Amino acid sequence: MKQNVIALVFGGRSSEHSVALRSAATIHAALMALGHRVHCVGIDREGNWRYQGEPCQFPGAVDRSAPLISIRPGHRSLSYTTQESGTVEIGIDLLFPALHGRWGEDGTIQGLAAMCGLPCVGSGVLGSAMAMDKDVTKRMVQSAGLVVVPWLAMNSMRPWEELVECLGSSTLFVKPATSGSSIGVSRVSNALEYAAAFAIAAREDTKVLVEAAVCGREIECGVLELEEGLMASVVGEIIKKEGHAYYDYQAKYDSNSVTGLRVPSLLPPDIVARIQALSVQAFRCLELKGYARVDFFLTEEGEIILNEINTLPGFTSASMYPKMFECSGYPPPKLVGALVEYGLSSASKERL
């Protein structure tokens, strides 16, 4: 593979800042193994872009004393200024966002890259924005014939009794419309719990979703876009053990979590094939690019229900997406290499 100059952008203002740092460390190691030049750009929690070096040691936090980054529209470059070196301009072939949540996964960074003429790994503005909003995602894929979890979207609280009647369940999930990593998500079964959960979710977003609880297995499938077409990974399953009612933040990222991942799943081949086909269908429905992880519930009756779609899935050591593709013949360096290749080739077709 040709050596490219890649700006790896990580951190960000969202509540998933710490997860993004861990994803970036994995991606950085893969890019270095492939022989690319990697310039690291950390976005601190206040939204400042800071140059972290080439390469980066990933100390666990964005260095807030590092120089600020400037981007000029129309120039495929980043620049920063120090007293010792003056202004340093770095030509960039590709932007690789390792960002999760708002101001990174929602189309904002993708729009900035497009305005500046910088090729960018992953989905564009439209697909990123639609997939980030769980309400919009559900409406889009439901219109395409996929089954989704029953839900209501709201900007202010509605009566508990009304929600139970509308959703047909007395156990509900309350979540922000645009957060990830299960941040701000609560499982509730009465009006008091609902009021507290709504307040938590509303701290993350002005739009809050309330969903009916689904009794079923939690299944995930990855999609990777290659020059020859879309590839669905093996299917993985989240194994919830005693102590976790659902796959929350602790279960996802705590090394002592009692929740496990089974990759590949032990599902029958026909069910796996259906999940893979639905993953590709959802990917196309939202006009996504590059890669995504699609999450489902599988009920005892065999119904496959789409839960949500992540356009910048986690790349941590505990993340399902890289595990599923490693079992599909794409270990992290090969997987990241495929993302780089497609990001560059799709940009050339779009004449960025």
Curated annotation (Swiss-Prot):
Main location: cytoplasm
Molecular functions (GO terms): ATP binding; D-alanine-D-alanine ligase activity; metal ion binding
GO biological process, one term: regulation of cell shape
Cross-referenced PROSITE patterns: ATP_GRASP, DALA_DALA_LIGASE_1, DALA_DALA_LIGASE_2
EC number: 6.3.2.4
InterPro entries: ATP-grasp, ATP_grasp_subdomain_1, D-Ala_lig_Van_CS, D_ala_D_ala, Dala_Dala_lig_C, Dala_Dala_lig_N, PreATP-grasp_dom_sf
Residues binding Mg(2+) 2, per UniProt: 308, 310
Matching Gene3D superfamilies: 3.40.50.20, ATP-grasp fold, A domain, ATP-grasp fold, B domain
Pathways involved: Cell wall biogenesis; peptidoglycan biosynthesis
Keywords: ATP-binding, Cell shape, Cell wall biogenesis/degradation, Cytoplasm, Ligase, Magnesium, Manganese, Metal-binding, Nucleotide-binding, Peptidoglycan synthesis
Catalytic activity: 2 D-alanine + ATP = D-alanyl-D-alanine + ADP + phosphate + H(+)
Cofactor needs: Mg(2+); Mn(2+)
Residues that coordinate or bind Mg(2+) 1: 295, 308
Localization annotation: Cytoplasm
Domain named ATP-grasp: residues: 138-341
Cofactor note: Binds 2 magnesium or manganese ions per subunit.
Class in the EC hierarchy, top level: ligase
Chain positions recorded as ATP binding sites: 165-220
Known role: Cell wall formation.
PANTHER family associated with the record: D-ALANINE--D-ALANINE LIGASE (PTHR23132), D-ALANINE--D-ALANINE LIGASE A (PTHR23132:SF25)
Name of the molecule in the record: D-alanine--D-alanine ligase A
Chain's gene name: ddlA
